[in-house]
Amino acid sequence: MSDQPYDLAPLALLRQQSWLSPAFPTGSYSYSHGIEWAVEAGHIHGRESLEDWLEADLRYGSGRNEAIFFVEAWRSATEDDCEKLLEVAELAAAFRGTSEFVLESSQQATACLATLRRVWPDRVVENLSKLLSERTVPPALAVVLGASAAGQRVPCGLALPAFLQSYAANLVTAAVRLIPLGQTDGQLAIAELEQAVLAASAQAEHATIRDLGSAAFMVDLASALHETQYTRLFRS
């Protein structure tokens, strides 16, 4: 790592925006994280029920765990601790409750890592890629982006909420197509989730691997049941 201070320099901000943009080629538009089944089953049927579902995911479910993985990857990259970074990556890869979540995580992260190496190569990204390849560990998006944020000297307190907001916004976009919702209702849902994003970020910043866990069983169940859903637009 360089000895540059951690701040949100304009160049780092531009890169962070690019990585979290819907235009970044991770294929995130193909995944609904179980929301497609939840809509089909009637658990999500409008903006308010969508907000409730996603807030629970962010505070108690996979969104919370992804935030912790992001923070731990950021810390490990900041400290140049390759063994810790590999441990985080291995745990993140294993911490998938369904086969569709494995697919969703590994395919997006693989595409993200390949693009970062080609467009914004740096030592952190190369080291992470080498570690994962040597140990045949599939990448997880939160780990890739957390480590990359550290490599660009972006403070975790700014990078993490941006990551979680992107996580929620991608799922809102899927729900807009599935329920369906109007575009304005989609933006209202994203706005309503801002406090949940900030709360989840604040919690995760003080958490460690020991705090991983989920109390949002319906999210995992939705993903498992989506695997056998007859008519599907999304891959998860």
Regions found by a protein language model. Give the residues of each.
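Glycine/small-residue-rich interface belts in oligomeric ring/scaffold proteins
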Residues: 7, 11-80
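C-terminal auxiliary extensions adjacent to catalytic cores
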Residues: 166-236
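A short glycine/serine-rich beta->alpha loop
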Residues: 14-24, 54-60, 94-101, 129-135, ...
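Internal, conserved structured core segments that host functional sites
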Residues: 67, 72, 76-149
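Secondary-structure capping and boundary motifs in well-ordered enzyme cores
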Residues: 9, 23-26, 62, 101-105, ...
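A contiguous pocket-lining binding segment that forms or flanks enzyme active sites
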Residues: 130, 134-182, 186
